[in-house]
Amino acid sequence: MKKVTKAVIPAAGLGTRVLPATKAMPKGMLPIVDKPAIQYLVEEAVRSGITDILIILGRNQSIIEDHFDRSPELEEKLAAPGKEKMLEECLGIANMANIYFVRQKQTLGLGHAVSVAKAFTGDDPFVVIYGDDVIWGEDPVCAQLIRAYEEFGRPCAGVSAVPWADVSRYCSLKTTPIHDNYFFVDDMIEKPKKGQEFSNYSILGRVLLTPEIYDILANTKPGAGGEIQLTDAMAEYARNHGGMTAVEFTGKHYDMGNKLKVVEAQVELALQHPEIGEAFRASLKEFCKTL
């Protein structure tokens, strides 16, 4: 079994659900305290043992490339005495992994975005980190999927039980318990209508795939929303290629395409921030007295 060392981050979305913040800035660059959202995704991959990361961009998103590149002018300024920590942080961003970029010339859906990564992943298994989904926790979700892949030898999906009223916004998996937080998956459906749901287990932003997915994607027709859905390709794999493993992951999920969840991410991660956490907690307590 090949070791999982590659990750793909589709980040070409327009971010229409969080306009006007994304009118001139990619959704992935929305800040959570002092880091853009996409940096949290890259850091999760690195913490999971990933060494090579492909970020899939759309038009006018070169700012993401700039963020993960060296910045000689800034580094020169930060070389002054007393700014060593900031310099170290900036250098670390550029050096944390081998990060590559490719443009998705047409935004035809998540499945199409993943197909763009074929030359990058080759014959290797790889993790897909959805660009909308920041998941915060001590145990990175990518690492949880990699462990499941090593145990069961099948593609994996990070799942969570969502309220039944919300299943139609996500996908629904047909699951059979294996042990602990692992389930066998032999079917799934994207954005099911009422009565089509298999369960209230939905994929929330992380999957681990094998190269066989590319042939399936090449023959996947547009589905929900008129887009090529990755879920449809994974459903085909689950039904006809030996099934998948669902991992009910641990970690707090934030949808960066949801304004309320963006604010929740700001507040909850600020409370855990090593520099401002305690001061922010005190400030928040005072503010809550006014509610």
Task: Mark where each language-model region is.
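Catalytic-core segments of class I nucleotidyltransferases/pyrophosphorylases
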Residues: V127, I146-E150, P177-H253, K259-A282
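Residues at the starts of beta-strands that form the adenosine-phosphate
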Residues: K6, T51-I53, N98, P125, ...
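N-terminal glycine-rich phosphate-binding loop and ensuing alpha1 helix
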Residues: K2-A79, K83, P140-V141
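Residue-level signal for inorganic ion chemistry
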Residues: I38, I64, A117, D132, ...
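Positively charged, low-complexity intrinsically disordered leader regions
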Residues: M1-A7, A279-K285
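Well-ordered alpha-helical segments embedded in enzymatic catalytic cores
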Residues: A37-Y40, H112-V116, A233
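Conserved beta-loop-beta/alpha segment of the NTase-like Rossmann-fold superfamily
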Residues: L74-E76, E84-T175, L217-A218
